[in-house]
């Protein structure tokens, strides 16, 4: 097996045994970035010097007999996470040259675990988008077909993992931004429960919805990443003060009894939904059958407020974004427009030039929803719908352990196909965004390839803080599902 084909689990075993070195593995992946990223556009910043320095240090630690969970493993980070001394752009002109003085907590934990950071990946600006076409720097292409999008907003991370330019990556998920690109790129993506992973040092889009999570080659790799990045953080007021399990224990006993005793719900509102691609629906049914063969009891459940989810989300998320992004004004840091008449003119011109069209669209939407006279009509109603959606999931989980659905209504669409149709783009989040509003975990696992050679994923949702059941079911599907994606032919 070539070095770039190693999973995180496989690379870790070979590193600790001395069969490979972190420097060789890191060099191999940096060479792939150099060879392929001009076509893919997965990265905004590549830190080759820093990565090789960290890899050399990891090799020295291994030679001394030291061990750490991710020692010598090359990873990538979505460029929404602060990295000390390495620019963090959020794929926006307004932060094009911003270099943080501190690491996000998740980044700190990765470094403490011995990880090697190869670079920062592309995204839709500030995480606002579903295709990674909204970056101020360049678009990212799907490794399986360069004419198609990789999904978004964590499209750079998903494309980098799929193209074997890093062993694993971190993304962020506000309405499906880990799970949807993972599905489109044929990799595994986990959005943890809200509060499971510290948000400190993540540049906020919608603070009550955002969550950091792993994008990996396998479900086991996702569990290994979760063991490192999860846990309470006093720096983050939304971080949950709960015990952290060993997520790899989710797979204990699988070989002996499969998934016997697990009960999965399929929301009746998702069956035959308008806009659902027939291939996606067929792949979803086949994946459910695989889980049934492993012992899962599949039942019918209801999420009755599904039809209101997209509308509510696209009031709540832009409202929070309009507040979070109000801090970017050209005064203390980031881009500042020159040649302005006065302070107010500088504010206006800086924000007009610094933000892209989709970000400005959502700021306007959010500001309108929060304005006097409209707050109760829009934000208030959307908040009440969110409460109803949370109650729907709570009631459904009284009947089952996990909930199954497609990840996206269609496989990855062509670049430019929906760029002028934001409503169609927003509706593509119908299966994923409810999990963010409910704060529950969601996993995207590859389950099929379309007839046009594009990956399709299955989404597995669980009760809040029950990532274990989600990972266990995902592992079962991964072990038994035929026709899973291999390596893109770059």
From Swiss-Prot:
UniProt entry keywords in alphabetical sequence: ATP-binding, Ligase, Nucleotide-binding, Protein biosynthesis
GO CC, alphabetical: glutamyl-tRNA(Gln) amidotransferase complex
Organism per entry: Desulforapulum autotrophicum (strain ATCC 43914 / DSM 3382 / VKM B-1955 / HRM2) (Desulfobacterium autotrophicum)
Enzyme's top EC category: ligase
Active site (record annotation): 78, 153, 177
EC number: 6.3.5.7
Protein name (record): Glutamyl-tRNA(Gln) amidotransferase subunit A
GO MF, any single term: glutaminyl-tRNA synthase (glutamine-hydrolyzing) activity
